[in-house]
Amino acid sequence: MTTVVSRTFRSSPHRDALQTWDAIVELLTQGKDGTARSELRAVTGVAASLIADQAPKSAPIVATCDGPRTRIYCLFDEDAIDGDDANEEVLGFEPLKGDWGVSLPCPKEQLGWVQSALKKHSSRIIARDLSQGIATQAQADAGQALSLDLGGFLKS
């Protein structure tokens, strides 16, 4: 079973979408320079656009790695000003350790251009329809493990 950690960032109007993405990049990279930071910075415009559209309000940005999964939500409007539900604390593990990936929630009508734009900069950063959840490896394995021999079933 995968451990999941959640963080919630204050966005607009507390900080703009670019500043919100910068804060998320700082959390995920723990302030360290490297390939992960470069790839996350390369998609700043696209990620900020999704944050400005309030995509991560109810559907999280999800970072996966060889360790725990990190879900990142954003607060907007009065919730962002108030900040009571915010949790921007540093993580107690390296959120992009080993084989990492980041999935950004995206409105369905923007999915095509967003996926195309992200692909130009990174194969590790993808977009998904914000109305769809994130499949875990256990779910994928379970789906593949179930198969029905229809011929054998009908003969019995």
UniProtKB/Swiss-Prot annotation:
Transmembrane segments: none annotated. Signal peptide: none annotated. The keyword Ubl conjugation does not apply. Keywords: Antiviral defense. One of its GO terms (biological process) is defense response to virus. CBASS (cyclic oligonucleotide-based antiphage signaling system) provides immunity against bacteriophage. The CD-NTase protein synthesizes cyclic nucleotides in response to infection; these serve as specific second messenger signals. The signals activate a diverse range of effectors, leading to bacterial cell death and thus abortive phage infection. A type III-C(AAA) CBASS system. A member of the CBASS system in this bacteria. It does not seem to bind a closure peptide, its exact function is unknown. Belongs to the bacterial HORMA family. HORMA3 subfamily. Does not seem to be able to assume a closed conformation, does not bind closure peptide. In the Cap7:Cap8 complex only Cap7 binds a closure peptide. Interacts with Cap7 (also called HORMA2) and CdnC; forms CdnD:Cap7:Cap8 (also called CdnD:HORMA2:HORMA3) complexes with stoichiometries of 1:1:1 and 2:1:1. This is CD-NTase-associated protein 8. The gene is cap8.
